[in-house]
C-alpha cells in the first residue's frame, strides 16, 4: 500500500454563522470560479455551530483578513492511502475504517493529532506539517511513502527522525467524548464539474442562505434534526455531503450516488469543542468500527467530529461505541 503526501499546504479555519456574509465573495469564488484562482484544495462544511474551511495557501489568499476568521495555528498537510500504483484519483479509495489499524491507530499511539476529511472520492488524513517527520517514521514500515512534488509523485525523502520514539504499548482506547446521533439521513455524492454551473444558484442558497424558515419548520418537526452540509472541490473533483431533504432540492440526474443508493446516519462526537491538540479521537471511533467491519466516512470540523455509517448499522455502531465508553469507567 502507498501513502501519498500531497503538496497542498493547508489552513483550517472557522467562521461563525452570523459572520458568513463577510466571506461569501471569496468562498463563492473558491467553490464556483476556481479557474480564476490558483486554489486546488477547498472544503467548506456547515454545522450547527459554524462553518469550517479547509483550504490551501493559495485559496486562503481569497479570504479577507478578519477578526471573524478563526484560524488553527498550524499549517496542515494532506495524506491519503492508495492501494497499488497510479495517481490517487484513479486508484481505489479506502474507507476510514480500513485505514484505522494501519494509519489512524499508529499515529494516535505516537500522540500525533490528525484531522480527517472523507470525501466521495477518498479519505484525507490531515497532519500538522511539523509532525511530518514523525508521521513518516511511524508509518514507514507499513507503507511505501510517496510525495507529490510539482504534480509528480516521487519517493518521499527519508527525514531520518528516530529520536523520541518509543514502541507504544497496546492500550485500550475508550471513547471519552459524548456521542449523539441526529435524526437526519445523509447521502455522500458528487457531480460532474461541467454541470456545476447549472446548480450554482441552488448550491449558493444551500450553503449560505437557507438558514431561514424552511429549516426552522423541519427543526420543529424533528427536534434531533441538525444543519450539516459539506462541499469539497479538491484537484478538480467535487464531493457533497448533505441530508436527504437537501438532496431532494437537486435535479436527480445530476448527482452521482452509489448503485445501492446508500443512506448514512451520523454520529457526532463531542460535548464541548474538541480543539486540535487531543490525540486519538478519530482512533477511538474508527477502531471499533473497523473491528465490526463497518464502513464509515469521517469529517472533522473546527469544533466537533462527525462519523457517517450505513443507516442499517447505526444501532450496532452506537452500541459498540457505548461499550467502549463504558470501558473508561
UniProtKB/Swiss-Prot annotation:
Domain ACT: 72-139, 262-322
Record-annotated membrane-spanning stretches: none
The keyword Cytoplasm appears for this protein: yes
Keywords: Cytoplasm
Location within or outside the cell: Cytoplasm, Cytosol
GO biological process: cellular response to L-arginine; negative regulation of TORC1 signaling
Major location category of this protein: cytoplasm
An annotated GO cellular component: cytosol
Family in the record: Belongs to the GATS family.
Function statement: Functions as a negative regulator of the TORC1 signaling pathway.
Subunit architecture: May form homodimers and heterodimers.
Official protein name in the record: Cytosolic arginine sensor for mTORC1 subunit 2
Organism: Xenopus laevis
Gene assigned in the entry: castor2
Amino acid at each position: 500500500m502507498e501513502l501519498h503526501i500531497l503538496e497542498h499546504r493547508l489552513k483550517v479555519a472557522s467562521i461563525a454563522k452570523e459572520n458568513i456574509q463577510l466571506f461569501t465573495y471569496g468562498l463563492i469564488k473558491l467553490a464556483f470560479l476556481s479557474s480564476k484562482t490558483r486554489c486546488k484544495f477547498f472544503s467548506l462544511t456547515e454545522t450547527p455551530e459554524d462553518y469550517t474551511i479547509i483550504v490551501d495557501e493559495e485559496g486562503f489568499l481569497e479570504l479577507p483578513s478578519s477578526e471573524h476568521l478563526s484560524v488553527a495555528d498550524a499549517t496542515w498537510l494532506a495524506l491519503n492511502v492508495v492501494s497499488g500504483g497510479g495517481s490517487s484519483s484513479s486508484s481505489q479509495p479506502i474507507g476510514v475504517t480500513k485505514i484505522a489499524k494501519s494509519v489512524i491507530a499508529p499515529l494516535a499511539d505516537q500522540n500525533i493529532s490528525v484531522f480527517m476529511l472523507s470525501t466521495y472520492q477518498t479519505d484525507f488524513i490531515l497532519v500538522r506539517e511539523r509532525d511530518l517527520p514523525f508521521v513518516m517514521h511511524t508509518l514507514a514500515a507499513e507503507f511505501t511513502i510517496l510525495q507529490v512534488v510539482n504534480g509528480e509523485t516521487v519517493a518521499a525523502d527519508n527525514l531520518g527522525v528516530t529520536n523520541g520514539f518509543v514502541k507504544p504499548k497496546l492500550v485500550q482506547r475508550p471513547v471519552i467524548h459524548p456521542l449523539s446521533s441526529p435524526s437526519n439521513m445523509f447521502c455522500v455524492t458528487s457531480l460532474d464539474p461541467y454541470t456545476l454551473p447549472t446548480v450554482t444558484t441552488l448550491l449558493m442558497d444551500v450553503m449560505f442562505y437557507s438558514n431561514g424558515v424552511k429549516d426552522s419548520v423541519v427543526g420543529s418537526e424533528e427536534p434531533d434534526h441538525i444543519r450539516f452540509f459539506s462541499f469539497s472541490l479538491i484537484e478538480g473533483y467535487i464531493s457533497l455531503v448533505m441530508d436527504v431533504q437537501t438532496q431532494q432540492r437537486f435535479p436527480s440526474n445530476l448527482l452521482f450516488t452509489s448503485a445501492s443508493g446508500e443512506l448514512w446516519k451520523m454520529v457526532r462526537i463531542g460535548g464541548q469543542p474538541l480543539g486540535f491538540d487531543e490525540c486519538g479521537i478519530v482512533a477511538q471511533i474508527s477502531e471499533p468500527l473497523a473491528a465490526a467491519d463497518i464502513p464509515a466516512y469521517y469529517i472533522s470540523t473546527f469544533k466537533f467530529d462527525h462519523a457517517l455509517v450505513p443507516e442499517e448499522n447505526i444501532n450496532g455502531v452506537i452500541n459498540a461505541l457505548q461499550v467502549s465508553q463504558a470501558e473508561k469507567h
